[in-house]
C-alpha cells in the first residue's frame, strides 16, 4: 500500500497484543499475500485470526458475531455478503456464473463469501499444511472439515481508491 496503512499497523501492534502485521518485500498477489499472513498467524501464539480486506468494505462489526460463533465451537466463521449492491452488473453476473460453475464441478464453496473470515488455530494449521502453490483459499478453507458458521453482513461502498480486480 502506498498510503499510511503500514505505519498504522505498526502503531497498533505496539499498543495492542492482538494486532500483528506482516510486510512483504513486494507485491505477490492477493491470495499469496493472504496465505503469508495466515501462515504467519498459524505459527504464532494466537487462538484465532480474522482476515479482512483493507478496503473498508467488509463490516468490522460482524467480527463480534464471528467471535461469538468461535466461542460456541466453530473453527471457521465465514463473513457472507447479504447482497452484492456495490458490484457492477458485470461483476454480479460473472460471480453468479462462477458459483454455478463451482457447484456443477462439485466444489464446496460458501455463496457470496470472499476472504472475510475468522479461523481457529486448529483450522489455520490444517490449512497451511496443504501443499498448494496455486491458491484458491475460498475453496481450500471449505475443504477443512471443521465446524463452521456464517455471519451475514451488508458490504459498504469502497472508502477510497479503486479495486485492482478487473470489473
Regions found by a protein language model. Name each.
Residues 1-7, 56-57:
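A conserved acidic beta->alpha catalytic loop
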Residues 4, 8-11, 36, 65:
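Alpha-helical transmission elements in cytosolic ATPase-linked domains
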Residues 12-16:
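Short, conserved SAM-binding/catalytic segment
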Residues 18-20, 147-149:
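Conserved beta-strand segments of alpha/beta enzyme cores
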Residues 19-50, 60-140, 156-167:
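Acceptor/aglycone-binding surface of glycosyltransferases and processive sugar-polymer synthases
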Residues 52-54:
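Active-site flanking residues adjacent to catalytic metal/cofactor-binding acidic residues
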Residues 143:
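Flexible glycine/serine/alanine-rich "lid" or loop that lines and gates the nucleotide-sugar donor pocket
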Residues 152:
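Conserved S-adenosyl-L-methionine
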